[in-house]
Amino acid sequence: MGQKVHPRGFRLGLSADWQAKWFNEKNYKEWLLEDEEIRKFIKNRYYHAGISEIYVERPDAERINITVKTARPGIIIGRKGAEITSLREELERKFNRRVVINIEEIKTPELDAQLVAESIASRIEKRASYKVAMKRAIMNAMRKGAQGIKVMVAGRLGGAEIARREWYLRGRLPLQKLKAIIDYGTATAWTKYGTIGIKVWIYKGDADI
């Protein structure tokens, strides 16, 4: 039986980048837990901001550089930068280090796999048809220039007694091609019948490597 490889981990250093850019043998465990806490804190605080990825860089032991990729930068920045200043000060108090926050706007959220997965999850939680939500996401991605997209949902679909999985594929999805730029995202929809898992793969073309 074939084993699945994470699309991002398979391409690290080629067409994908690391979400954490630091190494410290002595404090590795502490810093790793801090990274996860930072990501969870920002995601929970700005869950309506369309946050896709949060990168953490540590130039030294006293500084943390955070880059947030979001579809709605205005929510995080706030009026005249008040919100981002408040966030920075709170993180500095929490972790006792100097924090620098950079915001990167996602120009085309329809081509961001994480945002697409979260959008489908949100529609399912609002009792929309999972088939309609999947097909709409695929149509929007292809219209915006995706070369291929696959969406898979698993769970008690439509309130069925037995859990199952369904998927739709449009275009090409060369998962074994190292230079293929494949974005991957996951999300969970919480329904009264239980959880429904969503996975999204988007093929955006090939990297020059």
UniProtKB/Swiss-Prot annotation:
One of its GO terms (molecular function) is mRNA binding. The gene is rpsC. The keyword Ion transport does not apply. One of its GO terms (biological process) is translation. The keyword Ribonucleoprotein applies. It comes from the Bacteria. This is Small ribosomal subunit protein uS3. Gene3D superfamilies: 3.30.300.20, Ribosomal protein S3, C-terminal domain. Pfam families: KH_2, Ribosomal_S3_C. Coiled coil: none annotated. Keywords: Ribonucleoprotein, Ribosomal protein, RNA-binding, rRNA-binding. One of its GO terms (cellular component) is cytosolic small ribosomal subunit. NCBIfam families: rpsC_bact (TIGR01009).
